[in-house]
Amino acid sequence: FMDGDCYVCIQVDGATDYYASYTRLPKQSSPKEVSLVKDLEEGAHTVSVYKATEDMCVSFEVYSLSTDGFFTDPPEKPELKIEAYGDSLTAGRGTMRENGDKETDASSQENALLTYAACASRELGAEYRAFAVSGARVGKYDQSAANVIPQMISKYSPTANAKKTWNFSSWRPDVVIVDLGTNDVVGHKRNLFTSENFDEELKAQYKSFIERLKTLYPDSAIVLCCGTFSYSQMDHEKYNRLFAEVAESFSAEKKVYCHAFSPSTKGHPTHTETA
């Protein structure tokens, strides 16, 4: 996703179509005024803007908001909070394409609001946040720490130049979804790194990450999700079992669970498959 395009979903008055509201923002190197919504009928309206493409596509910052009317107090936020950590599956890669469409690296195919985690959060009426990086792993098997989620989550933003650190006490989720391990397995199959005891290393590093999350969020339930990505060389049954064993290694009071999905038709799931 190096084309530098940024897409957002602009929802007006509670609209729920995150496919139709997918909007490209013009790329700018300096602040520029952008019109998000116009020609609304006179009266009170609620406008929500969600970033749909991940940080490696492009970052954007809101400096101020203006209106030709006036701002009222925002609606109350949902009580239930769900947070997700993941790779391209959580970032929404490929979700903007239809079944049968060829998958590309264009950011225009990515919509994080159409992933299963985002859809489930809306079904449950929950506030949703995601920390997702395409190509990300849960384990570090060589000297490179690039795209290793446990070494990135303390950043406010995944980009290497992000200087702000994230305050985990500022927003405590009730449920944490973790969908990682796919790129670990794919990378190992493609010999992108060497590991003599890969399965055991993967299991140990995944468990270590969950232990860290339980330290940060001791009262949160954690759900390990797996099996979504369709890759011919991946033994889904074997690795779904491995991820289940990670969850089962925690005592019942820790509230760590595992859920395996059916693989997509090809590669990353489309928006109809995630729904």
Enumerate the language-model features and the residues they cover.
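N-terminal secretory targeting modules
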Residues: 1-85, 90-109
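Short, conserved loop/helix-junction motifs that constitute active-site signature segments
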Residues: 77, 171, 215-217
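Conserved SGNH/GDSL esterase-like catalytic core that processes O-acyl groups on lipids
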Residues: 102-203, 231-240, 265-268, 272
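N-terminal cationic-hydrophobic initiation segments that often serve targeting/anchoring roles
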Residues: 121, 213-215, 248-251
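Generic structural signal for well-ordered alpha-helices
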Residues: 206-211, 240-244
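Extracellular serine-dependent O-acyl
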Residues: 220-228, 235-275
